[in-house]
Amino acid sequence: WIECGEGSALGAIEAAKEVGGYVTGYVGDMTENGPDVVLVNLIWDLEPMFTQMLKDTHAGTFDNPWYKYGVAEGAMLYTINENLADKIPAEAIAAAEKAFDDIKAGKFTVPFIPQAE
């Protein structure tokens, strides 16, 4: 499962334990919540964004801007649960690494798709 949000991630971890599946931790490293079921983690590192906000505030230039921080800015990372790494095909790991590298290098832009009404 891949879920969005810490609460739903914790629920997905419990469900994976019950049925023997695998899950993606979300927001932070959730491996300790399910060391036998959390395959990978998508981690938010918002320190770069908050640092920029503080700098802008200190400089008097903070004017309610929209800060876009993601993979390219180092604010979205992933980790692999080393105890379960053998469950992930090497080509899948290589593809994920390439995608992250391409985003960081500006070779691929993740499209923004607003929610449809």
Please tell me what each predicted stretch does.
Residues 1-117:
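A residue-level marker of the well-folded mature domains of exported/periplasmic proteins
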